[in-house]
Amino acid sequence: MSVKASGGSSLARPQLYQTFAVSAISQAEQQDRFLEGSELNELTRIFQSGSLRLEIAETLTENADLIVSRAANRIFTGGSPLSYLEKPVERQPALVGASSDSRNGSVTYAESNGGGGLFGGLRSVFSSTGPIPPGFRPINIARYGPSNMQKSLRDMSWFLRYTTYAIVAGGPNIIVVNTRGLKEVIENACSIDATIVRIQEMRAASADYFRANAQAKEIVLQYFDILLSEFKAPTPANKVRQGPSNDIQGLELPQSYFNASAKRQKYAMKPGLSALEKNAVIKAAYRQIFERDITKAYSQSISYLESQVRNGDISMKEFVRRLAKSPLYRKQFFEPFINSRALELAFRHILGRGPSSREEVQKYFAIVSNGGLPALVDALVDSQEYSDYFGEETVPYLRGLGVEAQECRNWGMQQDLFSYSAPFRKVPQFITTFAQYDRPLPDQHVYGSGNDPLEIQFGAIFPKETRNPSKRPAPFNKDTKRILIHRGPAVNNQVGNPSAVGEFPGSLGAKVFRLNGGLPGAKVGKNTGTSVKFGESSTQALIRAAYRQVFGRDLYEGQRLSVAEIQLENGDISVREFIKRLAKSELFLKLYWAPHYVCKAIEYMHRRLLNRPTYGRQEMNQYFDIASKQGFYAVVEAMIDSKEYSDAFGEDTVPYERYLTPGGLQMRSARVGSIREDIGQRVDKEVTPRFVELGQVSNLRTEPEIAYRSNQGVYRQRQQTKVFKLTSNYDKVAVKNAIRAAHRQVFERDLEPYIINSEFTALESKLSNGEINVKEFIEGLGTSELYMKEFYAPYPNTKVIEMGTKHFLGRAPLNQKEIQQYNQILASQGLKAFIGAMVNGMEYLQTFGEDTVPYRRFPTLPAANFPNTERLYNKLTKQDKELVVPSFTPVVKVGG
């Protein structure tokens, strides 16, 4: 994998701590239910005690120095420890007429003799702060050193601050996250026993401020006890991400991140669970596999599988396997998607994560391509990773942020895959991103394709990712510059020719509006001189161009900056100053800065004021820094007061579009009405096929020669052939004509009535009455005694076959193979079988059907069949017994 690969820039906000309210709501949301009674009662208790906890935190904050000083005096000797305490910078409070205590009616439980002074020190000597560790020894300040003293006092202040935070939050999670594991860190610089003593001293000092309120004192003691226990606890081990594959990154998640994140409840199907607990486990499996509780949302369930897993007939692992193979899952998560996207969703549902690498995608893509959904499900469920994480009893869960360490190479895609809208995205994300690692950088913004505007007349339209999301992460580094197309002569681009920045584009670029040198507001600059080229004789035309350039449209009368317009017309300000005032106006601020995030606003302003897209991260980061430290107006001044603006536009020119992205140019060229005939036309050399070249005439031919050649080959007799087709038995004339045509085709002559015997009379009557069709009539003529006498008995079998194909198929035999086939039928089964094979064959049915009398077909393929058919028809029937088909001239003389 490329070391410069980008896994996307999806924004994630890790949870820094937990509160009971957030945890309860998160658990209810994960289980798709409302808050239970016990949870509501606990929330009620927390909210009711909120005022008291705020007052406790306020009291401890106001007396923090005294509390820390008392604890420091307990463990340090030989000086004043409090002088080493560095207080955090505090904002100056706003001046108000009355204090907040008098307005809110709050009561502060601080007492004048609570913790400081001489009596407070004596009280601390005789009061019990808890058991003192046996290894505790006071620390001399001079030997400890100023640096260590500052760190020690800072740690004491932090401990007190964490306690107040936890009291306000209503839960000890802040203390757990920030204190557990500090024991090993502090023991390198300070004694653990001394730290325990000072925490106990702060506990006693804080409790002394609430002697009048038992409930408040109990809360303070409770949280300090938690602080002590968490500090004494050993440092927990990091959570290591498991994975049997070599291409999966071995990552670790600190335990503090795991403790701070929202807990994801794990469900396991145990034999001893109650019916309600088993139902909860089954619903959790539905929520994981189908991303919703299908029994609650759609009143659907797979009852026979539920019964089996409840009774212990199948394990939860097998239950997950069968759910993923069910028709419901196939319909929702497999059939609507291509294989690569279905694979990504299957990873989410079964393993609780997205694909990790390209190699993993390739492996499972081959499985789903060869075996379909069942093979993919079996491969995932039977994997070693599934066994390590979930085993046989645990329901799969999402292993997202805070549950385990996340990989950077699929960061953005995995965060999107965990969202509820993942099934609505049809485009595969993982394989698309992995494939882009080895490809050139795309034509998009360095901070995401969602920042690329459509470069149309009314400005930049940034697409939202709510419908048909198209964001594509790309590994743009700080040295990458985008390729921009110059609107003007190519030799004048500012990258290859920096000295030509101030050159006007002419007819190849946008129209330039420049204040004429004779008008009051014109000033002579670097690229102006005394030339009046592109000069405007009317300041109103220039003002309209400035509005359109800066705002993208004409403004209403009430939105125009009339004062600035008058000053420009009077020559008090330059065009550059006029553009700056437009960009600093309230309308520009509301349109293009306030509604958008910084990256989008900077890109928009850059295209409006400097009239080109940004090059890369270096340029964007400079504007980011200015925007964060100085704000909107400083960004405007940085653009308009830049050297590039001065070189390109000077003091008297309205900014005009100088550069485009390739994508923007393509969108403009593809619009209806903007496509030119000489652009986008691909000129390909016409390649003449070989058979056409061979058929072309190489010399000039005269008309007599052409007439002579046109008479060769198949002559006009083919077009003059009369086809007899019997469509109705009621037309006796047509029946009679068809009968006579059949006689001429089969017997090669007309048969007079006195020759026709009773056999033919019966056939003609049946044909006239509709009892038989023309095909059966032809077959009856061929099997008659007259045909046998005239065309079978006097000739050898090969000659009989030639005449049979002539009479019944209208052609000569195709080749020796056909003669051999019919010869075998004729020799073994006789004339009737031979006639039946031809008349009932597929060739006869396709050519003549059941109602057409056979006729000469003038076949031209194969090439040798036409002359054979011609010779067969032109020769008299009983002229000789010479065969037609064996008349081919041999290529090699036999016996020569």
UniProtKB/Swiss-Prot annotation:
The keyword ATP-binding does not apply. Heterodimer of ApcF (a variant beta-allophycocyanin). Phycobilisomes of this organism are composed of a two cylinder core, from which six rods radiate. The core is mainly composed of allophycocyanin alpha and beta chains and of minor components. The gene is apcE. This is Phycobiliprotein ApcE. It is found in: Cellular thylakoid membrane. Belongs to the phycobilisome linker protein family. This protein is postulated to act both as terminal energy acceptor (by its phycobilin-like domains) and as a linker polypeptide (by its repeats and arms) that stabilizes the phycobilisome core architecture. Has intrinsic bilin lyase activity. Keywords: Antenna complex, Bile pigment, Chromophore, Electron transport, Lyase, Membrane, Photosynthesis, Phycobilisome, Repeat, Thylakoid, Transport. Its EC number is 4.-.-.-. It is a peripheral membrane protein. One of its GO terms (molecular function) is lyase activity.
